[in-house]
């Protein structure tokens, strides 16, 4: 994926659920060489922004942190082809 432009978005309501989804997706992502980023509140935003700049194809996010990253210009959703709302 292009920097800051994920191809898939999984939007979840809580940090805990984001971690569970990330844990479940990680083996699949590794097997097909997809970069996965988890963006949630309560964690350093800089590290999460770096993962997006690195070209993560799949993003698991909570709404508030995703909005923060969009507002900062660290994430653009115009290339997202798959969205999962949980």
Predicted feature descriptions by range:
Residues 1-86:
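SF2 DExD/H RNA helicase N-terminal ATP-binding lobe
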């Amino acid at each position: 994926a292009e920097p800051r432009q994920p191809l898939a978005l999984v939007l979840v309501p809580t940090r805990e659920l984001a971690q569970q989804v990330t844990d479940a997706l990680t083996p699949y992502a590794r097997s097909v060489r997809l970069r996965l980023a988890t963006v949630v509140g309560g964690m350093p935003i800089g590290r999460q922004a770096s993962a997006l700049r690195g070209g993560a194809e799949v993003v698991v996010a909570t709404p508030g942190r995703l909005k923060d990253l969009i507002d900062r210009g660290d994430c653009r959703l115009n290339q997202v082809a798959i969205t999962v709302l949980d």
